[in-house]
Each structure stands twice: as C-alpha cells, then as structure tokens.
C-alpha cells in the first residue's frame, strides 16, 4: 500500500467502496447559513452519529470550529475566494496548498472547476496544477465540478454532467463530485475512470426526496455523496444520516431507509 491508497481509505470505506462525506465548506462563499451558523455545534451533533466517513471543510473552519470526537477523514478545500457579494461565484482561485493541508492533518484536497463558465479555463488549469502538486505527495484530489449561473439548467443534463466528470478526471482528479442527473447517470459514471460522488445541489423539499436521490445515484454507479445542505438543513439531520448511511453502506432500499429514518425520529 502506498500513501495514496492509505489516504483514500480514510475517505472511501474499503468494505463497500463507497463514502458518506458531509460538506461544510459553504460558508466560504455564502456566509453563515441555517444549519452551520454555529459550525462547532453542528459538527459535534453530526459526528456523534458515527455515520460520517469524511468531512469537506475549509482551512479556517478546520482550525477554529472543528472538534469531532471521532476520527473521520478530512478533505481540505484548496480553492475559493469568490462570494455571493461578488460578480461571479465561478471566479475561484487557489487558496491553499497540499503542504498546508498535510500540516493541518488532511487526508485529501478539493478544488473546483466550472465547466462552461467564463472561468472554465482558469479553474481547470488550477485543478490540473493542484492534481500535480497532490500527486507529488500521494494526496487524493477531489474535483468539484461546478456549473455557474449560465449553466444551472444543465445540472440534469447527462451529457453535460458526463463532460464535466470526464474532464475533471482528465485533469487529474482522483474523485469527482458532481450532480445527479436522474436519467442516464450510469453513462456519467461509465465515462469517468475515477469514483463519482454526488452533490446535494439545492435543498430537497423533503428528506424522502433526499433518500430517493441518493438511492437512484447509487443504483447507477455513484460511489457515495459529498452533501451539505440536504443533511444539516434537514429537520432531523442525525436521523437522516442514519438512513443515508444505510443506503450507502448497507444497501438498504428507499422504503427500508425511510422506515429507519422514521424510527430514529420517533424512537
């Protein structure tokens, strides 16, 4: 086993080949949000479920507001510097280094690229160069394949999402985070040689919608989730995590997961 394999095992469970990653990096662009205003409390409550394989977090929050009792994997955000107050959320740049991530104790690094946006070229260059730096240290890179405002309607377009997933892998990402397309997602997975994990995207209306989305993705080859709002903005995030973990690692169907969710809520 080399360093890359060892670190990937901190993110993806060896037994199932899947992963449940909770993303808590939203504040870097969106500021305080319902569910992560008090990030330290949220982390403590969700960590207590013992369901989370890894967290996606920024270096600032990792340093100042992250105290899990367990030992989950850590994926450190290495791109950002664009907010909702600015002209374009896709105008990200590199904000950290592999060396800094390793000093902080991270197991992997994440960088965004925005396919079809005005900043496609620069964010892909940044992703490729970050991949080069990561691989010098045997550190996995999570490629976060974003869209941008002009392409939001393409979040369900299998051809467009497949393009992004493949391009991310071509530029060196070891894991891809992208959107679930509902149709032909198996083709997205088939065209990408590295594990594909789904983002939550906009908040689902109900927890059952979240379970259906995750189950559909898993059935079509997704290797898990990298999800934020649909977890920590749920009315019952701890109960939902138990149900999601059962979908991902115990092959529950939606009915079984929904029953587990209800039992955790009312039990």
Predicted feature residues:
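Alpha/beta enzyme core
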Residues: 14, 19-198, 204-227, 245-246, ...
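Histidine/acidic-residue-rich catalytic or RNA/ligand-binding cores of hydrolases
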Residues: 210, 235-244
């Amino acid at each position: 086993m080399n360093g890359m394999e060892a670190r990937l095992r901190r993110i993806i469970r060896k037994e199932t080949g899947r992963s449940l990653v909770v993303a808590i990096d939203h504040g870097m662009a969106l500021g305080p949000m319902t569910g992560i205003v008090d990030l330290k409390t949220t982390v403590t409550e969700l960590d207590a479920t013992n369901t989370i394989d890894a967290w996606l977090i920024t270096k600032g929050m990792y340093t100042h507001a992250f105290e899990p009792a367990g030992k989950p994997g850590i994926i450190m955000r290495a791109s950002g510097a664009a907010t909702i107050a600015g002209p374009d959320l896709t105008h990200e740049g590199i904000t950290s280094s592999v060396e800094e991530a390793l000093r902080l104790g991270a197991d992997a690094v994440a960088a965004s690229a925005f396919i079809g946006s005005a900043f496609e070229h620069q964010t892909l260059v940044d992703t490729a160069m970050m991949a080069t730096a990561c691989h010098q240290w045997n550190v996995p890179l999570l490629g976060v394949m974003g869209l941008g405002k002009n392409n939001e309607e393409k979040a369900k377009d299998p051809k467009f999402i497949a393009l992004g997933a493949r391009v991310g892998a071509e530029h060196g990402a070891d894991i891809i985070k992208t959107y679930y397309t509902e149709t032909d997602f198996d083709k997205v997975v088939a065209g990408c040689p590295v594990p594909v994990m789904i983002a939550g995207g906009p908040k689902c209306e109900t927890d059952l919608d979240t379970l259906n989305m995750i189950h559909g993705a898993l059935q079509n080859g997704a290797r898990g989730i990298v999800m934020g709002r649909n977890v920590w903005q749920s009315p019952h995030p701890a109960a939902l995590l138990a149900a999601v973990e059962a979908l991902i690692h115990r092959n529950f169907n939606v009915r079984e997961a929904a029953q587990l969710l209800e039992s955790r809520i009312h039990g």
